[in-house]
């Protein structure tokens, strides 16, 4: 049993070391067990299915704004990566920007550069700069490979559960089940959700820089998230949420602004 525990621990350690990458700008180390090519292929498939089930907006002005902001931020991202000799990280990207008809207040960017904005968020973005806040944030999630990291965390969580199960194999059945249940809750609250909040904060920071490089004033982010805060309903406590609280997010954005403003050219 002891040898098995050591063996599993070594496997997990090897995975963490070998499949470790670095997030641009923040320098945070992240685990990435799944090749970008596989992530992108899955992303493109899901994106195609989503479009088949959705209605694209016919508002030419709004559609034009979404595509314009998207292309501007795309160029900013490519410029940053080119200047830092990191263009290989954008290999396989097939950028696309669409506006879909939906009352949902939402937007997202799938790995590989597939961006969708919902018409329901436009009243809150108000203008092109507000939209750049949202699109910069969502594109930053993809650029930082947060989706791949989340999937990798899920795989590690499964491996960790297997390791604990082996370690407790000599314990009574009831005791083992209790431990495994506790492990599941502990992993979700203690590890998985905090990473989600880290992703959100990281996307805020990168998004501010990308929108600034694209020519949009990053100071508009404070106003946008203030509007989002007022529009939101009851929220769970921050420690059980995948997003930072509104107060935390706005405070963090204010801390990130001096850095982002260094990239801003009117």
Question: Whereabouts are the PLM-identified features?
Answer:
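A Zn2+-metalloprotease active-site environment signal
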Residues: 2-8, 15-266
């Amino acid at each position: 049993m002891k040898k098995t525990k050591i063996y599993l621990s070594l496997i997990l350690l090897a995975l963490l070391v070998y499949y470790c990458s670095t997030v641009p700008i923040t320098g945070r180390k992240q685990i990435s067990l799944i090749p970008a090519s596989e992530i992108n292929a899955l992303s493109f498939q899901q994106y195609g299915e989503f479009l088949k089930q959705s209605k694209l907006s016919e508002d030419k002005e709004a559609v034009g704004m979404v595509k314009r902001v998207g292309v501007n931020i795309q160029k900013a991202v490519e410029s940053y990566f080119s200047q830092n000799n990191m263009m290989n990280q954008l290999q396989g990207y097939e950028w696309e920007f669409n506006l879909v008809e939906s009352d949902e207040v939402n937007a997202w960017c799938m790995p590989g550069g597939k961006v969708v904005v919902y018409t329901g968020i436009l009243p809150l973005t108000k203008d092109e700069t507000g939209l750049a806040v949202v699109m910069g944030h969502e594109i930053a999630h993809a650029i930082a490979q947060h989706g791949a990291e989340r999937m990798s965390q899920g795989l590690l969580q499964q491996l960790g559960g297997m390791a604990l199960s082996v370690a407790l194999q000599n314990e009574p059945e009831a005791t083992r089940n209790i431990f495994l249940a506790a492990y599941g809750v502990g992993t979700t609250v203690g590890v998985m959700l905090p990473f989600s909040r880290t992703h959100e904060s990281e996307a805020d920071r990168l998004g501010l820089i990308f929108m600034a490089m694209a020519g949009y004033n990053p100071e508009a982010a404070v106003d946008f998230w203030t509007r989002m805060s007022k529009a939101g309903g009851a929220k769970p406590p921050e420690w059980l949420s995948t997003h930072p609280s509104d107060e935390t997010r706005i405070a963090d954005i204010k801390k990130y602004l001096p850095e982002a403003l260094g990239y801003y050219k009117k």
